[in-house]
Design a protein with these regions (language model features):
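A short loop-to-beta-strand structural motif that recurs across blades of beta-propeller domains
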Residues: 53-64, 101-103, 144-147, 195-198, ...
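C-terminal motif of bacterial Sec signal peptides marking the signal peptidase cleavage site
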Residues: 16-18
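Asp-box/WD-like beta-propeller blade repeats and closely related beta-sheet repeat scaffolds
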Residues: 101-102, 107-131, 161
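Conserved beta-strand positions in repeat-built beta-propeller and related beta-rich domains
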Residues: 28, 44-57, 95-101, 137-143, ...
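A short beta-strand motif characteristic of beta-propeller blades
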Residues: 20-26, 70-78, 111-118, 154-165, ...
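Short loop/turn segments that connect beta-strands within beta-propeller blades
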Residues: 66-70, 106-111, 149-154, 200-205, ...
Length: 301
């Protein structure tokens, strides 16, 4: 009897529950863009308004806080947010990326304390990242990441806002040790071959290199719990999230929803993965079961 061994590499980072088992947050959401972990819960930025608009001209934006199964509005519309995007927290202060500005709130009472505007007047500020006393801000339409000194969050020197590094259509920023991963997303404004995922190697003397070469509109970066993989959204693959193995650079995609969606942001918290759907005003919650390595499956005929 002839026997053959078939070795199958399973490129699966995680197994998620079927669509019928998934939990979905919908309460008090209206076009949720980004999530930020805070005090055991999740701050969520919402565009508000009648339709998805990255550059709202009315202050329809608001922030909710999800914890213990409840999602409550903590910064209502009308408080100076138009299309609030990425967020970052330092101490008790929340920094919010918005249309041509960064807005600062004191989380003790959720009061607005400052607003740092970009001088050009039309900056698409997409995401923020805190590292020590520095705040990194991505601006997709300028092909730039900026740096702001936030040593004293109540007394920020607005003139400290400086260009940091140039790279194509920067959107989501994610810190990994002494490196920053940057997704590229033109938000439908340009079709460019260099819309990929980059890594900034040396933060003191920034240089960039690609870690994914496939053209796409990338958004929402997260790490697997053991930091061996990068999980991401590619908005050119509707309803799917991707995962990349750092060890060998291979990646694959996992379907999250059959709905026409715009998956925009990812957050891993307490063994669950939260996935923002900007278009449908939903956040999917998935249980996460992870494999550390590829699984070898041997079949004998």
């Amino acid at each position: 009897m002839a026997k053959s061994n078939i070795f199958v590499l399973v490129l699966v980072t995680f197994i998620v529950a079927s669509c019928s088992d998934k939990t979905v947050i919908t309460s008090n959401l209206l076009h949720p863009y980004a999530m930020c972990e805070y005090d055991g819960g999740i701050l969520i930025s919402n565009f508000g308004g009648d339709a998805v608009d990255y550059n709202n001209t009315k202050a329809t934006g608001f922030i909710t806080y999800y914890k213990n199964g409840s999602n409550q509005v903590v910064i209502p519309a009308g408080n100076g947010l138009y299309s609030p995007k990425g967020m970052a927290v330092k101490e008790s202060f929340l920094f919010v990326a918005d249309v041509n500005k960064i807005v600062v709130f004191d989380l003790d009472g959720y009061k607005k304390v400052d607003e740092i505007e970009f001088p050009q007047g039309d900056a698409f500020v997409g995401d923020l990242l805190v590292m020590g006393n520095a705040l990194f801000a991505s601006v997709a339409n300028y092909d730039r990441i900026y740096l702001l000194d936030i040593t004293a969050p109540r007394q920020i020197d607005h003139t400290s806002l400086l260009e940091y590094v140039e790279l194509p259509c920067p959107s989501t920023l994610k810190l990994m040790g002494e490196y920053i991963l940057v997704s590229s997303n033109s938000f439908g404004k340009a079709d460019r071959e260099d819309k990929i995922i980059h890594i900034i190697d040396d933060l003191g003397n920034p240089s960039i290199r690609p870690i994914i070469h496939e053209h796409g509109d990338y958004q929402g970066l997260a790490f697997s719990p053991n930091k061996t993989r990068l999980i991401f959204c590619n908005q050119e693959r509707n309803g799917y999230i991707g995962n990349l193995v750092f060890e060998n650079g291979e990646y694959s995609y996992e379907q999250v929803t059959d709905d026409k969606s715009l998956l925009n942001s990812l957050l891993l918290l307490d063994g669950k993965m939260y996935i923002c759907d900007l278009l449908n005003s939903k956040i999917y919650i998935k249980e996460l079961i992870e494999f550390d390595n590829f699984s070898g499956i041997i079949k004998t005929d």
